[in-house]
Amino acid sequence: MTPSALKKTVLLLGTAFAAASVHASGYHFGTQSVNAQSTANAAAAEAADASTIFYNPAGLTKLDSSQISVNANIVLPSIHYEADSATDFTGLPVQGSKSGKITKTTVAPHIYGAYKVNDNLTVGLGVYVPFGSATEYEKDSVLRHNINKLGLTSIAVEPVAAWKLNDRHSFGAGIIAQHTSAELRKYADWGIKSKAEILTAKPPKPNGVAEAAKIQADGHADVKGSDWGFGYQLAWMWDINDRARVGVNYRSKVSHTLKGDAEWAADGAAAKAMWSTMLAANGYTANEKARVKIVTPESLSVHGMYKVSDKADLFGDVTWTRHSRFDKAELVFEKEKTVVKGKSDRTTITPNWRNTYKVGFGGSYQISEPLQLRAGIAFDKSPVRNADYRMNSLPDGNRIWFSAGMKYHIGKNHVVDAAYTHIHINDTSYRTAKASGNDVDSKGASSARFKNHADIIGLQYTYKFK
């Protein structure tokens, strides 16, 4: 793989795929409120606290006071892989580790504030994590020539306003300013040319395969990039009667152009010896600029709440997400690069994602005046069609959420929420063919199987200004 190949694939796949998290399908982080998490995110129509800013900002008109809500989610993802096969561009087996865990525990904070201007108008501000992911393989993994390390964090800042038209109807709107930063590592096999010369020698060398297999000349690049993008949110909430409420929330797409630089390193003596020769022969610079455009998708949520009694409430939510926006991605470089079949300044991938839906149901029961118990279940559809479109850094699959939690009032001003979620994720598999030669990527074919699940622990504190 040429230096351009590595850098190009790194930035493209890192930024395009990093937005996925093990505990939410596609790009989404999964939960932005512990109060919502306790019902598997089914309680958007409840509008229990200032975190309604994310799920339905029209719900701000339902709050009984100005307040601030601070949330923390501890995410314990578990992705274990087992490689079935991995060959380089010449067809020789890749040497290295064939199994392991590629995730670590992460913490995501969210904070919301609401201010009641008057009985009809409430304004608020949310700072939350809408998208995030982190996976890392062993540096000697046989899948290292695909993606070795992946990390992305998006932080959104959203001012909102909610207006109560009358006792039944409320409307809300927000402007989303989203900052996304990405980090990725990918390895390249710089010994491909030497291997190919040995394997295609005329007459054939008696021990050609064994000789070629001994050539280990990997290099790698670490890439970081960031960008601001902007979107909006629109919401409506309708109290049908004293027991039933429905809501609709729309979150727009957010477009990003992430730009980055690769920091190169040669691994081992053989790769270091090839470094200057490869750069000179192919006309590459060590820190060339590159860009890739990605779009985080819009979503539409319809949700409801029904008061069964003075103590019991039921919740439901259906969310549709336009993941099909991510059907193609291109990374464009400043200069054309020499590739196997000519020249190219870009790499194109076609993940061909499909639109998805998530369905959730939940409920709450008031045990005593200060204590409420909550629970929920949800089905979350994956946008990945099959193993041929799945990335090794994104082993996404259909998932089921099982959530439970509690809410405890301490006097008139303090509220504490706690929640636990276990996410069952279908076992998945991954297949990729070797690079076509039309771009600068020279990875070989590989396949792997994944066993995935996740657990989330949430803690939330709300202070009401009364």
Swiss-Prot record:
GO cellular component terms attached to this protein's record: cell outer membrane
Membrane is among the record's keywords: yes
Primary site of residence: membrane
InterPro entries named in the record: OMPP1/FadL/TodX (IPR005017)
SUPFAM superfamilies, A to Z: Porins (SSF56935)
Molecular function terms from GO: long-chain fatty acid transporting porin activity
Classification via Gene3D superfamilies: Outer membrane protein transport protein (OMPP1/FadL/TodX)
Membrane topology: Multi-pass membrane protein
Keyword annotations of the record: Cell outer membrane, Membrane, Signal, Transmembrane, Transmembrane beta strand
Residues of the signal peptide: 1-24
Name listed for the protein in its UniProt record: Putative outer membrane protein NMB0088
